[in-house]
Amino acid sequence: MQMRIAFLIMAHDKPQQLLRLVQALDCAQASFHIHIDRKVDQSPFLELLGNRANVHFLSDRVVANWMGFSLVEATLRMLAQAAAHGFDYCVLLSGSDYPIKSRADLIAFFERADKEYIAFWRLEDRPSWKHKVQHYFPIDAIPIRNYSSNREPIYWRRLFWGRFFKYRKHLPKRRFLKGLVAYGGPDWWSLSYRCVEYVLNYVKDNPGYKRFYKYTSSPGEMFFQTIILNSEWARRVENFDNYGNWSAARAAHRIVSDGDMLPDEDFNYRYVDWSGETSAARETPAILDERDWESLCNSRSHFARKFDPLRSASLLHRIDRELLGISQ
């Protein structure tokens, strides 16, 4: 039976870039389940991709807020739609991602795959993340993006979040969910059908879990990791044992900082440049360009991000030509 890959894509702008991403991945084994932020007009995306039989736009869209639970809700809806159509593996992407391995290479990889490709860490191993679950964050009610900017027109947003972060340490802390260990990790992952089935059933059977994460910070970077890593699926996660050894070594040496984390790329096969966290030379994460060519060529990853259609134009053409075998 042919390997079936469902690509789940969250996008909010740049319809032509989304078209290019779909074209780079499109093949007989692929289906696409796309969520377009409800804040934007979906018609430009439908005009470009709506007539493709294997492209399915989510009809019950959500207003997607950066760092909000709305992003988890959009992902859950895409997962449910993809599961109804059937797949062997699903791959979660953003509209600013792009493959750096050919379609043939991706299919060959997933035909042999027997793991869950999701990067993770225990919040105990990354203490700077603990606040994300220790306080109530009403991000979907009061969007947090750019709240401190002088261009922010809604004064009460600046006031609320400014006061929140100033006095947060004095607020009572939430108790984490009983019987679970808190995990985090990047949004972007590749999961098998049976693992996704488990996740969807867990969410349905445990409504309190969803309620808890609705008021956390960046739940999309914790929600799925915590379900999977607290289940029998944990041992199927790529590099699970390596993480355990690394974590034990840190504990033995009483290391409690965020430094020297294992590379996410070793778990989820996604290339992202975070050098901007320690240098002002690039954004966080970096918009990739020709400077990144050698790193992409040497990467084991399947996908990279972020790409911009203008700033990454030369790099994208080179990826098409030399890595994906797509003629111009």
Where are these regions (language model features)?
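ER/Golgi luminal nucleotide-sugar-dependent glycosyltransferases, focusing on the catalytic module
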Residues: 1-328
